[in-house]
A protein has these predicted regions:
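Pepsin/retropepsin-fold aspartyl endopeptidases
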Residues: 19-286
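Bacterial N-terminal signal peptides that target proteins for export
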Residues: 1-9
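Bacterial N-terminal signal peptides
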Residues: 10-18
Length: 286
C-alpha cells in the first residue's frame, strides 16, 4: 500500500501533540463486528465528532491514531505540523485534537491524532478508510479479536491456550520472541502484511535467517522493499511456528533501537488474540 512516502511506517510521533487530556468512556454493547480484508486487515465502523458510519482500520501498531486529511477537514480540525518517524527517516505529518472518537463501546474525547493522506488505501481495499485506530483508543479495556467470528469483544478476556508478557514502549506493544534461537523484540502489529524484520545496523553482523528473494511488503501506512527470509523456528511464548516466511528490511528507522521488527498475528495462522494492557498480557490461540 503506497503512501506519499513509500517507506512510511507509523512508529513514533517525534513532536508531541499538546492539548486537553483525552477523556474516555464506554457504551453498553461490549462487542464490535468487523470486516476482514486480505486475511488480516480489520475494518470497523465508528464515529468521529458528529460524523457517523465511518470506516476505521484497526491497527495495534499505529501510534497514535491517524485520521484521513479529508475527514479532518470535514471536522474542521485545527491541524498543526509535526514529524513522523519512518523507515528511511522522518516525514511531515499534521497533528490535531478530535473532539470525540467512538469505536463500538470505546470512546475517547479530546483525542490527539495524526492527520495524513490515507488515499493510498484505495489501491488495496474496496472501502474508503477514514482513519487508522491504535491502542490509544481500543486499549482502554482488555479486548479479544476473534478472526473467525469477525468480532471484537471488550471486557475481561477468556483464557486462551498461549500467553506471554506484553509491554508498551513509546506507545507500541512489544513482545519478546525467539527467532531461530536468537532473541528479538517485535511490535505486535495487526496491520502488518507479513512478519517484518529489521537487519542489524552493524555492517557484517550475522543473521539467523536465510535470504531467498526480493519482494515488497507493507504495514498499514506504507510500502517498502525487502528480502524474503525463512525462519526455521519462531517462538511466541511456548508456541512454536516453523518454516515461517518473513521480510528482511535493511533500512532500520534511525529513531528505532527499541525493537527488531513487526509481527502480524493473523498471518501466523492465529485465530484469536487477547490484549490486556493493564496486566501486560498477550494471549492467543491457533
Amino acid at each position: 500500500m503506497r503512501g506519499r512516502n513509500d517507506w512510511l511506517l507509523v512508529l513514533v510521533i517525534l513532536l508531541a501533540v499538546a492539548g486537553v487530556p483525552a477523556a474516555s468512556g464506554y457504551t453498553k454493547s461490549p462487542e464490535l463486528r468487523f470486516d476482514l480484508y486480505r486475511d488480516y486487515l480489520i475494518v470497523v465502523r465508528g464515529a468521529a465528532g458528529p460524523l457517523k458510519g465511518l470506516n476505521f482500520l484497526l491497527d495495534t501498531g499505529a501510534s497514535p491514531t491517524v485520521l484521513d486529511r479529508r475527514l479532518a477537514r470535514s471536522l474542521h480540525l485545527d491541524e498543526r505540523p509535526g514529524l513522523l518517524a519512518g523507515v528511511n527517516g522522518t516525514v511531515t505529518a499534521g497533528q490535531a485534537i478530535v473532539s470525540s472518537l467512538q469505536l463500538g463501546p470505546m470512546r475517547r474525547d479530546n483525542l490527539p491524532v495524526v492527520v495524513e493522506d490515507l488515499s493510498f488505501f484505495y489501491k488495496a481495499l474496496p472501502v474508503h478508510i477514514d482513519g487508522v485506530i491504535g491502542l490509544d483508543v481500543i486499549g482502554q479495556s482488555p479486548f479479544e479479536i476473534d478472526y473467525g467470528a469477525r468480532e471484537i469483544r471488550f471486557g475481561p478476556t477468556p483464557s486462551l491456550k498461549n500467553a506471554l508478557p506484553l509491554r508498551m514502549e513509546r506507545g507500541l506493544p512489544l513482545v519478546d520472541v525467539q527467532l531461530d534461537q536468537s532473541s528479538a523484540k517485535l511490535v505486535l502489529d495487526t496491520g502488518a502484511s507479513s512478519l517484518i524484520l529489521f537487519a542489524p545496523r552493524t555492517p557484517g553482523a550475522g543473521s539467523p535467517v536465510r535470504i531467498s528473494a526480493v519482494l515488497q511488503s507493507s504495514n498499514t501506512m506504507g510500502e517498502f522493499a525487502g528480502k524474503t527470509v525463512w525462519l526455521h523456528s519462531l517462538m511466541l511464548g511456548q508456541a512454536e511456528f516453523r518454516r515461517e516466511p518473513a521480510v528482511l528490511v535493511h533500512s532500520r528507522p534511525e529513531t528505532n533501537d527499541d525493537f527488531d521488527g513487526l509481527v502480524s498475528p493473523a498471518l501466523l495462522g492465529i485465530t484469536k488474540i487477547a490484549i490486556d494492557l493493564d496486566r501486560g498480557v498477550f494471549a492467543f490461540s491457533r
